[in-house]
Amino acid sequence: MSIPFSNTHYRIPQGFGNLLEGLTREILREQPDNIPAFAAAYFENLLEKREKTSFDPAEWGAKVEDRFYNNHAFKEQEQVEKCEQELAKSSGREETPVTPFEESTEEEREQEEAAALKIQSLFRGHVAREEVKKMKSDKNENLKEEADN
């Protein structure tokens, strides 16, 4: 933060910006009439959640911000796992398992090649018919113009 025409810069504590971003997001989402009361309730809820899950979004946000500048903050695998668990709990939806890509058999490849060949030949035939139609219409227009003259 800076003041116009001043060389003074205030340092915002790590994680504080993340907390304010979360509050702002919720205020914009909920559109409360009494913003200070809503903010107090939001921070109370955040404190309760932090006590129950031992996950601090401010600390996590500070580490994310720190990672942007130097990549040493996320060497702790334990914190990342906690974050992933918290996100999985809060999202409320289950992730679908990833199925590995299976190679197609020789028979499937032959069928795919035959289908591709058929599609290509049909498209080429379509383009050729359109060209013939265009040539016929141009020829008819030329004959009409000659007949009119």
Swiss-Prot record:
Its main location: membrane. Residues 83-114 are annotated as: Disordered. It is found in: Membrane. Residues 83-96 have a biased composition (Basic and acidic residues). It holds the Pfam family RIIa. One of its GO terms (biological process) is binding of sperm to zona pellucida. Residues 112-141 form the IQ domain. InterPro entries: cAMP_dep_PK_reg_su_I/II_a/b (IPR003117), DD_CABYR_SP17 (IPR047579), IQ_motif_EF-hand-BS (IPR000048), Sp17 (IPR012105). CDD domains: DD_CABYR_SP17, IQCD. Keywords: Membrane. Residues 103-113 have a biased composition (Acidic residues). Testis- and sperm-specific. GO terms for cellular component: cilium; cytoplasm; external side of plasma membrane; neuron projection; sperm fibrous sheath; sperm principal piece. It is a peripheral membrane protein. Homodimer. May interact with ROPN1. Sperm surface zona pellucida binding protein. Helps to bind spermatozoa to the zona pellucida with high affinity. Might function in binding zona pellucida and carbohydrates. This is Sperm surface protein Sp17.
